[in-house]
């Protein structure tokens, strides 16, 4: 299994246990789903206790957690402060500067860095459109939530599909470290 970690905080943000695709060589998108499960239980794609008769709510003292599977599995923390347009823009500006510095440190060429800047700017502009931005949710990893560094903010967007609204986690590829487990 591949784990995708934040290059700056070492937080686990996602894994290849979710359907995923690389968009424009820039953004990893992970397809999730809403789940109900016993607290602390980690499930890989394909198993959903809420549809398998193990609801956990009926006369049980067990704690049940509900949410998006990739958020629960990787213990991501929702950060409402990024829902403010000015705050998110400011974050993007400082974060992209850090990513460019990381790319330089990792020996990326000026052409690769220029291409990244062009693509990331277009992606951020697309997120900032009013109708889209209002629908986004923002999450961070545990270490960043504890103040142990400034890393990547995971952006979650719900998209209408045949099976209903489906959550997608979006992460900047250049700010991730892939680790085999």
UniProtKB/Swiss-Prot annotation:
Pfam family, one: TCTP
Domain of life: Eukaryota
Gene Ontology molecular function: any one: calcium ion binding
InterPro entries for this protein: Mss4-like_sf (IPR011057), Mss4/transl-control_tumour (IPR011323), TCTP (IPR034737), Translation_control_tumour_CS (IPR018103), Translational_control_tumour_p (IPR018105)
GO CC terms of this entry: cytoplasm
Record-annotated TCTP domain positions: 1-181
Keywords: Calcium, Cytoplasm
Positions in coiled-coil regions: none
Compartments (UniProt record): Cytoplasm
Function: Involved in calcium binding and microtubule stabilization.
Family the entry assigns: Belongs to the TCTP family.
Name of the featured protein: Translationally-controlled tumor protein homolog
